[in-house]
Amino acid sequence: MLTLPSRLASARLSGALVTIDKNEEPINLQAAYSIQEQVSEILGVSSEAWKVGSTSIEAQRKLGTTEPGAARVPKQFKYTDGAAIPVFPDHDLWVEGEFALRIGIDLPPREQPYTHEEILTAIDGVAPSLEFVGSRLKGGIGKSGRFNATADGGANVALCTGKIMSNWKNIDLSTNQVDLSLNHKVVASGLGNKALGNPINVMTWLANHLRSSTGLRAGEIVSTGTCTGLVKVSAGDQIEANFGVIGKIKAHLINAVIR
């Protein structure tokens, strides 16, 4: 039988579902992130994008956790505004409206924690984004658990980011509303404060999460967790999110072809 990382990587490309045997389940977060990294290596080149999840009470409840989690987005699953995004029907698909923040300077590994002020200075742009989440595991997101979901790419299916807004620092992201539409009807709304109180707090968490390993590099973009909750979607759906002065983003879902 193929290793768990090989099976998870294959499932992202084939639409299959994976059963994790008891003897290969990650026993802690460190083991889960190790599997996640192996999956990324198998899939190949990563994008310059990160996703952070479980930044809202709803998302944490769904995964059975009390803290965020992160994953780098593989290049083949990173999209831009207006994209046709291929998805598999068995992967328990949901969409979230999220603020994406871009880093303007390197934030290298170091012993001292990064402060909120340092991160605020380092961010050089904000963009609307849609993250599509799901599970390659039998039972879906709700039954996967934190460790298994982390191993499975942090539940990421695809990330779609919009136009970067550079002149944004006079905007309070915590009170900025996001309206999520499914097939031209608003189905969910929320404020930036759903993401750890403020999307900037999410970026601070990620910088400190990565300061003992890779750090963050200038030009990388980070989706900061759902402001709209999770909305069930499937192939054929049209999705749009309106972030007010920050802009809009849209995507439509199509049936994936097995790779």
Regions found by a protein language model. Name each.
Residues 244-246:
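Beta-strand-rich extracellular modules
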